[in-house]
Amino acid sequence: MKQPAKIDVAVLMLFFNRPDNFQKVFDEVKKARPAQLFLYQDGARGERDVPGIEACRQIASDENIDWECKVHRSYQTKNQGCDPSEYLSQKWAFSIVDKCIVLEDDDVPSQSFFPFCKEMLDRYEHDERIAMIAGFNEDEVTPDCEDSYFFTSVFSIWGWASWRRVVDKWEGDYAFLRDKQAMRQLESVVRQRGLRKDFIPMCRDHAHSGKEFYESIFWASMLLNSSLAIMPCRNLINNLGLSDDSTHFSGSMKTTPKAYRRIFTMKRHELEFPLKHPKYVVENVDFKERVYKINAWGHPFIKMSRSLEELFLNLRFGNFSSIFKAMARRWRKTIGRDKHA
């Protein structure tokens, strides 16, 4: 006999061919026992992917979903790639439910993450100022935070939740790039906030590719709608780290600059309930400035020092292939063939 669902919320899980990682994330979802589960898996690139794909499907099989849960599956027969798979999977889930939690196969949540997202999804469901709930906090524990969470314009997609009303605003065709007035305003916002200078060129490249890159689509939508994210005062997500088969990162932990290495070794915490709610919806600017510094956005000297640190670490550990690849990327950027290196 199956256990009853513990929390009335939907969870979308994106996975591919990494059963060891996926098992860790699935185990936490299994403890939380959400009422609905969306399972999205991309198709194989070739025969080498098949064993991992089948192992992941076994983890998420009906026999392993031992609680009462409405299960939706979208298993692709052809390989779509990371993009547009993430965009397609999220549009699929949010076409069925009004609000949902999203976890990729390297985002391990604390148990507090689920009731936190559920409460935020219900509380701010109709507040157009709020576009998403984040789980990953780059502070780990935000100082001088008297409430359970705060508001910010900078966020991570390592474990998040949102609403259909937000996803419906996503412009998968990058239509905003053809709106001259919107682009003037967006360029001013990017410049005034000190955001990455290649953001708009990146959006143009993504649009030209004919694929939907949900991160640039989501970020542009947040900026164009002056939206805020909800950030827990304590970090609720572990990312499983750097590896050659990571979705968004590759490389070695030992050759990663210390400031970035900290992000991948950060602890996840639990929140205390009942939650303490902020009285006002106002951005935590101090947090934003710390995140900018961590990521070297608008800090050219920090960015340069990180590059030198990475070069030193690669030399120290004899990782010459990474050095040559970095040099090649820098050369392509110099001659205009790689704008985002």
Question: Could you say what each language-model-derived stretch is?
Answer:
Residues 1-102, 107-341:
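An acidic/histidine-cluster motif and surrounding catalytic segment
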